[in-house]
Each structure stands twice: as C-alpha cells, then as structure tokens.
Curated annotation (Swiss-Prot):
Domain of life according to the entry: Viruses
Name of the featured protein: Major capsid protein L1
Biased composition (Low complexity): 481-502
Gene: L1
Keyword Protein transport: no
GO cellular component annotations of the record: host cell nucleus; T=7 icosahedral viral capsid
Length: 508
C-alpha cells in the first residue's frame, strides 16, 4: 500500500496593488466647438490715454487725506478693462445674421495693437538711506559693523521688462508674503517669519518685480531701507504663468508677450545683526576684529542695461489665430483685460522752480520736482460670433459662468414651492399689514473691489476697417485690397436756363 497525502488549498490575497480609474470629471470644451464665427468684423480704438504723477510715491498735502499727486511709475502694471457693447443690442447692417430666439451673439478678439508714446529712456530708482555695509565686489579688508547707522544713498536702474497679457478676466499674480506660524511654535520678536505664496489678481498700479523679488516688502522688510523707495512699502507681483496656463477655461490669459532683461551691477552686504549665524564648520576662526566674521547677507543691485527700439514689443499688430487655452479669444461679459508693463520708456523728468528771482545761482532757493508721464493707445479688431441656445450649450455655459445667461436674459426656472404661501387680494388695503415693494436687486460687479483703468469702447465700433491703421493691416492679412471710389457724380441739369433752346432737327 502506498500512503496518500492530501494537501489543503489555502487562498492567499494577491500582493499586487490594484489601481482603480479616477472618478470621471466633466470635460472642458473649447469655444470653437460651440461658437460659430461670422464674416463680420469691426474695428474699435481708444483715444490717447495719458497718466502723469510722481514716480516714487503719491503726494498728499498736509491735513488732507486726498491724493493730490498720484504715483505713476514705469514699474507699475497698467491694467486696462476694455468694455465692449452688447452685440445682441448692437445695430447690425444685416438683421438676418442670427435668430434671437435660438442664438446669441458674442465678440471674438482677432487682432490688437498696443501703441506707446514718449521716447525711450532709462529710469533711475533708489533710496537715500539704503542698507549698504561694504562693497563686496571690490572691497578692502572687511571688518565688523561697528556703526549704528551705515546706510548710504544708492540708486539703480532696475530690471527691464516688457509685458502684455490679454484675456477676458484679470491676470493672476503671485508674491511671497508673511505666513501664519503654528501655535505650537510661535516666533519670537526678531525671528524670521514664515513665508507663504499668495495669488491675487493684478490690479492697475501694482508694482512689478524690479530685480529684488516678488514679495510684500511692507511686512517682510521692516527696516524700510533694503530696497528703493518706490517698492519699500509696496508689494511686487509677478504674473503666475503656471496658474494661468493651467486654467481650465483659459479666460485670464489668451496669450502673452514677455521680454525681461537684467544683470547684476554692484554687490553689497547688509548691515545689522545676523539672525542665523554662520556655521563654524564653514570657516577658520579669525583674529582681532575679524571674529566673528563680517556680514554674510549679500545683495546685488540690478541693472536693466541698454534700451533699444530693435527689441520693442509695442507699436506693432498681433493676430490671434489660436489661444493657448480653451478660450480662443471669446470676450465673455463683453470685456477685455489688457495687462501691460513697459520699463523702456522710463524717463523721470526733473522740474525746477525758483522761490524768487535769482541774480546769482543759489541751490537753496531752487525747488526740485520729479514727474513721470505715460502714453497709451489701444486698437482692436473684433469678429462677430454666434452661439446656439441648445440645452447642452446652456448647461455648459451655466456651469462655466452663471452670469452669462443672466446677461442674455435667460433665467433658470426656480423649483416649485413645496409650502403654502400667503397671497393677499387687496395689497394696498389699510386693513392688512404693509406690503412693502421690494426693489429688484441691482446687479453687482464682481470686480468692483479691484482697481482697473476703464476704457469704454461701446461707441467706438466701426465696420469701415480701411479707415483705421490696424484695420488696413488686418485687411492686408486677409488679402483684401480696397480701391478708392473714382466715380464722379454727374452734374444735375439746371432747373431754369436763360439761353435760347436750339431748334430740333426735323426728320425727313
């Protein structure tokens, strides 16, 4: 006999991880999928836009909270909020363009040109009390900082920037600000605060990065002497290209133009107590006044270098064929946001005025002033488009932006009331409680709390493209050549004549 061994089967779970597919999300549809473009184009342009002010700070007279001289600097963002007419209320040459019961009209931006006036110039910014200890580029033997105040009068020519961002919502900026410390480890007085990256819309008048970083200098530099005057109490923002490029709908940035340039001109170190001591393993201990070592907090002053007309982004047309996001130039809300920075026209004009008539030169009797001026002009070419009011399209637009349907006078039906409501017959009777008429709620502007330069183009649309510089350039792109009319009208016959009419020849 042979022994028979029976082995029990034991089930063991698989050690291989199983990855489940992610939960399906709603797909973002590009505007070209539901927007139908027509062959109707319009030109719209602004007037000459001027700004004059002090380049470093705003000025208010004593005892007056009103700003008498605003701050106008080339290192500020210029954010133009361009308002367009409602195409559904627009007087169209052809009334058969669309069916108002089944379609709605929108504008599409297909071309623009940002005009800049004033000559090229290099602007200088600085601080009369700049935190500078040693010239670490060409320094003699550096010793300990023994003076209580070693600040110096330093000026720089900041970073050179040309920037243009186009979209139908404000551009998004980023900067570093003071964060919130944990309650378990609160910082002591004089400790380095925690940092936090903050995103916020770029507003008109916000400061651009000039070479000292994108940060909130008012809260992170309490000495007020680490940067030039124009940003020492301001926040420098840098466009968050990553966030705007990843925007699902692509409204904040259809496309952008950018050119930045700088190099380090001088190298200094900061005066003051070192908050984080230099590790002893990184150096050999010195003698006399070289122990401990001098300040190791270094800073470089930027320089934007030469400005030239060969590297200009402005005063030339740009045509939008394909946007970087899903919004291919559709102006939702009948508005366009143009964010501009141009530091190549940065001349700060110095103005002098004498307090009395001078026979000999005396600087104490001459007052010096500084002003900065800016000049802009905006031109656009818009294309008329229409959207079919299908159920799928309206549901998608309501998910994207619920205010669009309200602007088109399309409302969603409210749910049916489940409770019994009271309705009086005689509403104005004195026998019942007062029935106050509730006025309709005014439509609030969600961007009213932000500051923009409003440009109203509602009365500037024209279908005669050949009458405007940008319109003629656009027609050249399409290969359309307009010929001037050379036909002359015939002179009308005089109503009365003093000459004797000639006798008609009789036909024989």
């Amino acid at each position: 006999m042979f022994p028979i061994f029976l082995q029990m089967a034991v089930w063991r779970p698989s050690e291989t991880k199983v990855y489940l597919p992610p939960t399906p999300v709603s797909k973002v549809v590009p505007t070209d999928a539901y927007v139908k473009r027509t062959n109707i184009f319009y030109h719209a342009g602004s007037s000459r836009l001027l700004a004059v002010g002090h380049p470093y700070y705003s000025i208010s007279k004593a005892g007056n909270s009103k700003t008498d001289v605003p701050k106008v600097s080339a290192f500020q963002y210029r954010v133009f909020r361009v308002r367009l007419p409602d195409p559904n209320k627009f007087g169209l040459p052809d009334t058969n363009v669309f069916n108002p019961e089944q379609e709605r009209l929108v504008w599409a931006c297909v071309g623009l040109e940002i005009g800049r006036g004033q000559p090229l110039g290099v602007g200088v910014s600085g601080n009369p009390l700049f935190n500078k200890l040693d010239d670490t580029e060409s320094s003699t033997i550096a010793n300990q900082d023994t003076a209580e105040d070693s600040r110096d009068n330093i000026s720089v020519d900041p970073k050179q920037t040309q920037l243009c961002i186009i979209g139908c919502t404000p551009a998004i900026g980023e900067h570093w600000a003071k964060g919130t410390a944990c309650r378990s480890a609160p910082p002591a007085q004089g400790d380095c605060p925690p940092l936090e990256l903050v995103n916020s819309p770029i507003q008109d008048g916000d400061m651009v990065d000039i070479g000292f970083g994108a940060m909130d200098f008012k809260t992170l530099q309490e000495s007020k002497s680490d940067v030039p005057l124009d940003i020492s109490q301001s926040t420098c923002k840098y466009p968050d290209y990553l966030k705007m490029s990843a925007d699902a709908y692509g409204d904040s940035m259809w496309f952008y133009l950018r050119r930045e340039q700088l190099f380090a001109r001088h190298y200094f170190n900061r005066a003051g107590a070192i908050g984080e001591q230099l590790p002893s393993t990184l150096y050999i201990k010195g003698t006399n006044n070289r122990d401990p070592p001098p300040s190791s907090v270094y800073v470089a002053t930027p320089s934007g270098s030469m400005v030239t007309s060969e590297a200009q982004l402005f005063n030339k047309p740009y045509w939008l064929q394909r946007a970087q996001g899903h919004n291919n130039g559709i102006c939702w809300g009948n508005q366009v946001f143009v964010t501009v920075v141009d530091t190549t026209r940065n001349t700060n004009m110095t103005i002098s005025a004498t307090t009395q008539t001078l026979s000999t030169y005396n600087s104490s009797q001459i007052k010096q002033y500084v002003r900065h001026v800016e000049e802009y002009e905006l031109q656009f070419v818009f294309q008329l488009c229409k959207i079919s009011l299908s159920a799928e399209t309206m549901a998608y637009l309501h998910t994207m932006n619920s205010t669009l349907l309200e602007g088109w006078n399309i409302g969603l039906s409210p749910p049916a009331a489940t409770s019994l409501e009271d309705k009086y017959r005689y509403v104005k009777s004195l026998a019942i409680t007062c029935q106050k008429d509730q006025p309709p709620a005014e439509k609030e502007d969600p961007l009213a709390k932000y500051k923009f330069w409003d440009v109203n183009l509602q009365d500037s649309f024209s279908a005669d493209l050949d009458q405007f510089p940008l319109g003629r350039k656009f027609l050249m792109q399409l290969g359309v050549r307009t010929k001037p009319s050379t036909t002359t009208k015939k002179r009308s016959a005089p109503s009365s004549s003093t000459s004797t009419p000639s006798a008609k020849r009789k036909r024989r």
